[in-house]
Amino acid sequence: MDSQSVAPVVLVILDGWGYRDALDGNAVLAAETPVLDSLWAAYPHTLLQASGRAVGLPAGQMGNSEVGHLTLGAGRVVPQELVRISDAIETGSLFQDPLLMQVCRQLRERGGRFHFVGLCSEGGVHSHIDHLYGLLKLAAQAEIPAYVHAITDGRDTLPRDGARVLAALEKELQWLGNGVIATLSGRYYAMDRDRRWERTQKAYEIMTQDGPGRGQSAAEVMEAFYAQDLTDEFIPPTRLAPGAVQPGDAVLFFNFRPDRARQLTQAFVCPDFSGFQRPLLPALTFITMTQYEADLPVQVLFKPQNLNHLLGQVVSEAGLKQLRIAETEKYAHVTYFFNGGIEQPFPGEDRILVQSPLVTTYDQAPEMSAVEVTDKAIEAIARREYSLVVLNYANPDMVGHTGNYEATIRALETVDRCLGRLLAAVVDAGGTTLILADHGNAELMWDENGNPWTAHTTNPVPCILVEGERRKIPGCGGDVKLRSNGTLADVAPTLLEILGLPQPPEMTGRSLLQPAEYTILQRQPSPVGR
């Protein structure tokens, strides 16, 4: 091996691979995962908290991929948008926001209407229904007609929870005496992020083309779709009442997570949009709850938080090269989210995007593109030029979301086989690998009543360190342990220690590494897999 070649430090993120002792509904324990099982038995390991306050969310709130990757890359607990927005509503500062005050004033002057587009869900991953309630209260106080274009969930919530949520929303609208639910659309259509423009087009057209309504309540329409075996995620775009977005109106997209809100927003606002043919609505005021993309011609209600000295930035400033690699479904997570919401790569940061399979749901292709991601990563590692490699395997999360137990087992087994190949390449390069997950999912596939569980969980996630010959941990004498009570915020400091780089003061996480002689003997957790 060339003495000048680089021995990489590789961060492998098993998206949605949570830890849970119980066997019932646990695809992780049901899957044959000999690689991970042997690693857990032979190498330093621990469990990390990946939900709630450990990642800047309310206590008891399940983690998610965006929050997980942001925390991993930041090396600190970052107050999440869910908390920022909820606090603004609770304190009343949202109702005094200058942007909202100006928009309400303009709508009153020109007789415009206020449209609220977003995921009507209690999941707290992309949005929260309480935020919509706050916005509807604002519109009612300003005496501006409100129209809700409800996107139904079924992924971060139970598959048939939408009827209950929308029935409560209709009661809230009646109590306010202002507003109607104009349209429904499952997130499968309205929140696609894989450039399946035919889905986005159906959602866009139901929101912008007027016509007669169904003459039924939202809950009644949902129950009718349930009878056709269509769950919340897959509700076809449907008009409940006249109320299309028109020139002179205002739209507020109240999702706070950007990745699944971008395509629909682009269709509304981009003059050079090419996803499908549509007229650009003139004189339309478009507001997004958070910044979805740096150059979108929209107004942003909650501006991005400025985070400095992120992991990628520290590695870049040290003059080291790094690589981010994932398939389409998780590409934004290892790039945009991992970099703290920064679109552009840092100097010396290369990126590889592998196309996800073009299927309706990923239980139809549980292998997804894991093999291709692994092939590309092995090729890159063989070049011996990257000091840090960040790789995401999407399968456990994306297939777990389908609720298909057998397909999720196949997804996990695929990842395990790919991990074996990847580790062989890292070992050959003398590198060190840190394997972990960003949140739970696949370890819980049905609830206590036997119904499919398609959401994330609050369970901890496994973390395994595979130390390489040319990346021995400084100061540990070749014998290192991972401490307990860690969180995702501790991962970036850990990687910096392995790389031999100083931890910046902005990173408040603590390295998970400790010499074996300083480790207090503790009960070992049970294995990751079978």
Curated annotation (Swiss-Prot):
Annotated residues for binding of Mn(2+) 2: D15, S65, D438, H439
Binding, substrate: H126, R155, D156, R187, R193, R257, P258, D259, R260, K330
Family designation: Belongs to the BPG-independent phosphoglycerate mutase family.
Domain of life of the organism encoding this protein: Bacteria
Cofactor: Mn(2+)
Assembly and binders: Monomer.
Protein name: 2,3-bisphosphoglycerate-independent phosphoglycerate mutase
Catalysed reaction equations from the record: (2R)-2-phosphoglycerate = (2R)-3-phosphoglycerate
Regions crossing the membrane: none
Gene Ontology biological process terms, A to Z: glucose catabolic process; glycolytic process
Chain's role: Catalyzes the interconversion of 2-phosphoglycerate and 3-phosphoglycerate.
E.C. number: 5.4.2.12
Keyword annotations: Glycolysis, Isomerase, Manganese, Metal-binding
Active site per UniProt: S65
Cited SUPFAM superfamilies: 2,3-Bisphosphoglycerate-independent phosphoglycerate mutase, substrate-binding domain, Alkaline phosphatase-like
Molecular-function GO terms, alphabetical: manganese ion binding; phosphoglycerate mutase activity
Any Gene Ontology CC annotation: cytosol
